[in-house]
Amino acid sequence: MTTSFGPATTSAPLKDHKVQIPSFHGLRSSSASALPRNALSLPSSTRSLSLIRAVSTPAQSETATVKRSKVEIFKEQSNFIRYPLNEDILTDAPNISEAATQLIKFHGSYQQYNREERGSRSYSFMIRTKNPCGKVSNQLYLTMDDLADQFGIGTLRLTTRQTFQLHGVLKKDLKTVMGTIIRNMGSTLGACGDLNRNVLAPAAPLARKDYLFAQQTAENIAALLAPQSGFYYDIWVDGEKILTSEPPEVVQARNDNSHGTNFPDSPEPIYGTQFLPRKFKIAVTVPTDNSVDILTNDIGVVVVTDDDGEPQGFNIYVGGGMGRTHRLETTFPRLAEPIGYVPKEDILYAVKAIVVTQRENGRRDDRKYSRLKYLISSWGIEKFRSVVEQYYGKKFEPFRALPEWEFKSYLGWHEQGDGKLFYGLHVDNGRIGGNMKKTLREVIEKYNLNVRITPNQNIILTDVRAAWKRPITTTLAQAGLLQPRFVDPLNITAMACPAFPLCPLAITEAERGIPNILKRIRDVFDKVGLKYSESVVVRITGCPNGCARPYMAELGLVGDGPNSYQIWLGGTP
């Protein structure tokens, strides 16, 4: 069985403190569609991987004068991601400068404006949290819920990387919102920007050794690659010291420079002044559990256990990534491929070596080609492995055999394995608002529950006592929050990015358009006689950057222009 991939061919200033987002009234029906040009085949087995790719990445000239993108200059002149952001946030202007717009990404925020309004731009900021494994404390959830009402647009957005997004925050409120998150067990540091982003792991709170080990490893990797120079706290809480603790193995791995990985005299020992060439994404999981879309990450880490279920080490994949540019076939989505196996005690050193290889060799002249996947595509996996091993100080061991991957959503009621239960609630496109927002707060607050965000934009209520199951089920049902068996299977697995009206990269609808699109797909299924239970995974993005991972969907719709999409078929999430 093979899986085929291929392309089908300014408003008035705000008077109120909240950004008003208009409703969407549907896409115009269109019979026009681009036709496939090149079919790109991918075996479904993880043991014989091919790549999603079109052509080779253009090599950077070694003889020409080294050029750098504008963002590289901004980073160099920023005093470790401080200037001019630290000055811009103090002005009365509703927006920040071009340089500060790039720097604030490292702090976990994007400057946006409502693209459906004409005239002068109504600027606001999207704030994204960083939650390794999707873990969210009770205190942080209630804080985010409050902030959405007080400073946002009244909704919370769950992302495909297990984080919150808070839209519509005005510049004058940024410091208040950021400081509130920091002081309530949260962080936005590194949720965006040219560094390691949120580290994914299965969200299910299963009391199994492999799951617990995967989640702890994800948290350790996140700590290892967190910025160290203090710029985040200097700007948002005036340098206030936030007490945190790190496992000693994380500190040791970060400080180790026995193979030339570090900048020894820098406040950023791993990143230096320039950080990474581009964003960097990592996921950790256990065999069979592909809730994290493991092969779409720059680094994919898989726990390997012995026959008794004891973790022994990790298989590592490298070079995945979804983003591309329309009609530029030197850009492409790509699946990660195996680089090798490492013992469990070496995982932090191996990950650090891969990150440093990208830091030193990734392109910094053209950001379209700056992701790790293009370096590996240009070099080939053998050369890449050889260079990584120099920083790692060891040879990778042969990749261990793995079973086939399965898509896991963890919706509904499940036993954790420690005497407690968890409940996975489906959230259409990750948007928590209205009655759902009110009811979730009521349940989470009443029972003092922690939650987890899944990579499929859903939410899990954790550590539920058996006696609470019935009243929680009743409360959710009375609010119209349906159990999975009552939700259309198309909706259960569908995902869409926010797109219009706030995303600056969107070229058509995604989140606001997907309800109507799914209804039309269901109508087609009914006409051809497909059973209700027979479904496909549908993912929609408003641009080719692939935030909802559409290239891995069985049916992927990728925005190609106003009210038009490329159609990508045959993925296996």
Swiss-Prot record:
Cofactor or coenzyme needed: siroheme; [4Fe-4S] cluster
Signal peptide: none
Major subcellular location class: plastid
Cross-referenced PROSITE patterns: NIR_SIR (PS00365)
UniProt KW Chloroplast keyword: yes
Gene3D superfamilies, alphabetized: Sulfite Reductase Hemoprotein, domain 1, Sulfite Reductase Hemoprotein,Domain 2
EC numbers on record: 1.8.7.1
Compartment(s): Plastid, Chloroplast stroma, Chloroplast nucleoid; Plastid, Chloroplast stroma; Plastid stroma
Gene Ontology molecular function, alphabetical: 4 iron, 4 sulfur cluster binding; DNA binding; heme binding; metal ion binding; sulfite reductase (ferredoxin) activity
Highest taxon, organism lineage: Eukaryota
Reported modifications of this chain: Phosphorylated; this phosphorylation reduces DNA-binding.
Organelle targeting peptide span: 1-54
Binding site for [4Fe-4S] cluster: 497, 503, 543, 547
GO terms, biological process: DNA replication; negative regulation of DNA-templated transcription; plastid chromosome packaging; sulfate assimilation; sulfide oxidation
Keyword Cell wall biogenesis/degradation: no
Any single GO CC term annotated in Swiss-Prot or TrEMBL for this entry: chloroplast nucleoid
Swiss-Prot/TrEMBL catalytic activity: hydrogen sulfide + 6 oxidized [2Fe-2S]-[ferredoxin] + 3 H2O = sulfite + 6 reduced [2Fe-2S]-[ferredoxin] + 7 H(+)
Cofactor note: Binds 1 siroheme per subunit. Binds 1 [4Fe-4S] cluster per subunit.
Keywords, in A-Z order: 4Fe-4S, Chloroplast, DNA replication, DNA-binding, Heme, Iron, Iron-sulfur, Metal-binding, Oxidoreductase, Phosphoprotein, Plastid, Thioether bond, Transit peptide
Residues annotated to bind siroheme: 547
Family per similarity comment: Belongs to the nitrite and sulfite reductase 4Fe-4S domain family.
Subunit structure, interactors included: Monomer. Interacts with ferredoxin.
Purpose: Essential protein with sulfite reductase activity required in assimilatory sulfate reduction pathway during both primary and secondary metabolism and thus involved in development and growth.
UniProt protein name: Sulfite reductase [ferredoxin], chloroplastic
Biological source species: Glycine max
